[in-house]
Amino acid sequence: MAKRDFYEVLGVTKTCTEAEMKVAFRKAAMQWHPDRNPGNEEAEIQFKEINEAYQTLSDGQKRAAYDRYGHAAFEHGGGGNDGFASSMADIFDDLFGDVMGRRGGRNGPARGSDLRYNMEITLEEAFQGKLASLTLPTSITCEACDGTGAKAGAKPRICPTCGGQGRVRAQQGFFAIERTCPQCHGRGEIIDDPCQACGGAGRVTRERTLSVNIPPGVEDGTRIRLAGEGEAGTRGGPAGDLYIFVSTKPHPFFQRDGADLFCRVPISMTQAALGGEVTVHTIDGKEAKVKISEGTQSGKQFKLKNKGMPVLRSREVGDLYIQATVETPQNLTKRQRELLAEFDAESSNKTHPEASGFFARMKDFFENLSGQ
């Protein structure tokens, strides 16, 4: 007979919370408890099924394994209790070993954890690239004991509790649970005479200074991997990696979109009407001339080719887009007001074609609407 889905057994959905699952388990357990159903074989079977479902789904790692493999996660290796315990350990290693950075034998060499470092740079540094110096605390292999954790001349002995496996099995109900050995804490060995420098850990914490090359063109979220610069491994295992995540500080003038840069430049009303030339600064610290054409409207963009950001690990370069923002004059003198009034009197549809066309279209729209 095929096993029922564990979520179905408890009467919960796959997205239920731990609290919801606990309430459902208590309700079902009370309903089918053998003491409440004496002599009822079906109740006994139901109760065992409920208990098995809850024992699996209430444990985060087991639940992840069940969601991924289903009942097959617990049936590998012959279906017996020993098969269950060993298969679960293997599955948990597959699921979580890489994340924790501890793949390998249970009491053998273990890889050190990866480290993450967040680095914030300026847009100019992202443009030019830089050689950055990092000082960070990290675990390194203890030189005094060469990572063994034992004092010079002493050797660790096999843990008598787990027999060097680093894990022990405990019987719970009709199945077994495998857990980390409480005596050796998963090492598989006991250090009777620990190294004084590291206290038996095999690693010590030190500050290290590293030089990191930030290449031109890095963007927010760029990840730089320094292999072997993470935490030291244990029992002779390799060191983890150091991952540097780069972010860019907001710039007061430029906004970035990929390799392109955008900049808003205010121009006067007369510059917009008559045309002219403005000088802008580019990201490389140089100056560039931008020709403003006659009749430029606010929001119009002018492109300066190859004045943007370099493309990471490429010879390509983005562009710089200058967006003109027409500034309306303020605090006018009497003479300026008179001149603007004269200009307005001389204005026609030709001088303001967009406005004239807009109001003409609006008038036609509402006249046609009222005539329907």
From Swiss-Prot:
Binds 2 Zn(2+) ions per monomer. GO terms for biological process: chaperone cofactor-dependent protein refolding; DNA replication; protein refolding; response to heat. The keyword Repeat applies. It is found in: Cytoplasm. A zinc finger (CR-type) spans 129-207. Residues 5-70 form the J domain. Keywords: Chaperone, Cytoplasm, DNA replication, Metal-binding, Repeat, Stress response, Zinc, Zinc-finger. It comes from the Bacteria. Pfam families: DnaJ, DnaJ_C, DnaJ_CXXCXGXG. InterPro entries: DnaJ, DnaJ_C, DnaJ_domain, DnaJ_domain_CS, HSP40/DnaJ_pept-bd, HSP_DnaJ_Cys-rich_dom, HSP_DnaJ_Cys-rich_dom_sf, J_dom_sf. CXXCXGXG motif repeats lie at residues 142-149, 159-166, 181-188, 195-202. Its cofactor is Zn(2+). Zn(2+) 1 binds at C142, C145, C195, C198. One of its GO terms (cellular component) is cytoplasm. Zn(2+) 2 binds at C159, C162, C181, C184. One of its GO terms (molecular function) is unfolded protein binding. The keyword DNA damage does not apply. The J domain is necessary and sufficient to stimulate DnaK ATPase activity. Zinc center 1 plays an important role in the autonomous, DnaK-independent chaperone activity of DnaJ. Zinc center 2 is essential for interaction with DnaK and for DnaJ activity. Homodimer. This is Chaperone protein DnaJ.
